[in-house]
């Protein structure tokens, strides 16, 4: 069945929390303090209400999620463009490229073609053993670092989406 992409709604919160906590278990084991890794239902609801939280469904079940924090929102990214965060894939789906498909859909359909943004940003932890390299393989480049007081250095990354702006 073809995956379905849509904005999350409040009734998705419990399913998103369960998926997020399972997906971020390795992050917790590494001691990295990403907000999503320690989410509760209130934080999931806040994310849905304040940001553009997207889900990917298969057979009516949420299998992945990704969120955009907008420059005009309460927690903007560093560059005045939408900022990716809270990216999680159901670990039970196996290595099927689901995260890649969701990220590509977000970059192309939402960011490039709908919002017409020239680039997008994200942040990850310098201590994470493979996320920086994964994003570099997907076309992201390092663009800065900042100590946000979370016990790691946040590495900011950008990806150019449009060259005509």
UniProtKB/Swiss-Prot annotation:
Q: Name one GO molecular function term.
A: acyltransferase activity, transferring groups other than amino-acyl groups
N-acetyltransferase domain residues:
3-162
Under which main EC class is this enzyme filed?
transferase
**Which pathway does the protein contribute to?**
Amino-acid biosynthesis; L-cysteine biosynthesis
- Phenotype of the disrupted gene, per the record: Cells lacking this gene almost lose the ability to grow on 2SC as the sulfur source but are still able to grow on sulfate. Moreover, in contrast to wild type, they highly accumulate 2SC when grown on fumarate as the sulfur source. Addition of 2SC causes growth inhibition of the deletion mutant but not the wild type grown on sulfate as the sulfur source.
Say yes or no: keyword Iron present: no
What is one process in the GO biological process aspect for this record? cysteine biosynthetic process
UniProtKB keywords: Acyltransferase, Amino-acid biosynthesis, Cysteine biosynthesis, Transferase
Gene3D superfamilies, per the entry: 3.40.630.30
Q: Which domain of life is it from?
A: Bacteria
Task: Give start-end of the signal peptide.
Answer: none
Write the Enzyme Commission number(s) for this entry: 2.3.1.-
Q: Which SUPFAM superfamilies match?
A: Acyl-CoA N-acyltransferases (Nat)
The cross-references to Pfam families, in alphabetical order and at most eight, read:
Acetyltransf_1
Family, similarity comment: Belongs to the acetyltransferase family.
Sum up the protein's function in the record's words: Catalyzes the N-acetylation of S-(2-succino)cysteine. Is involved in a S-(2-succino)cysteine (2SC) degradation pathway that allows B.subtilis to grow on 2SC as a sole sulfur source, via its metabolization to cysteine. Moreover, 2SC is a toxic compound in B.subtilis at high exogenous concentrations, and this enzyme relieves 2SC toxicity via N-acetylation.
What more does the entry say? Answer: Fumarate mediated succination of thiols increases in certain tumors and in response to glucotoxicity associated with diabetes. Therefore, S-(2-succino)-adducts such as S-(2-succino)cysteine (2SC) are considered oncometabolites and biomarkers for human disease. The demonstration of a metabolic disposal route for a S-(2-succino)-compound paves the way toward the identification of corresponding pathways in other species.
Q: What is this protein called?
A: S-(2-succino)cysteine N-acetyltransferase
Q: Which organism is it from?
A: Bacillus subtilis (strain 168)
Q: Which gene encodes it?
A: scmL
């Amino acid at each position: 069945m073809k995956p379905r992409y849509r904005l999350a709604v409040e009734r998705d919160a419990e399913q998103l929390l369960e998926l997020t906590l399972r997906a971020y278990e390795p992050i917790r084991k590494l001691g990295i303090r990403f907000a999503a890794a320690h989410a509760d239902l209130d934080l999931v609801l806040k994310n849905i209400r304040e940001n553009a939280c997207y889900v990917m469904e298969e057979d009516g079940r949420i299998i992945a999620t990704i969120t955009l924090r907008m420059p005009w929102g309460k927690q903007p990214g560093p560059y005045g463009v939408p900022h990716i965060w809270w990216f999680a894939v159901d670990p039970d789906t196996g290595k099927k490229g689901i995260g890649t498909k969701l990220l590509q859909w977000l970059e192309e359909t939402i960011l490039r073609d709908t919002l017409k943004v020239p680039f997008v940003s994200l942040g990850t932890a310098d201590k994470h053993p493979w996320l920086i390299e994964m994003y570099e393989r997907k076309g992201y480049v390092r663009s800065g670092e900042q100590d946000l007081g979370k016990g790691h250095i946040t590495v900011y990354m950008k990806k150019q989406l449009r060259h005509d702006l």
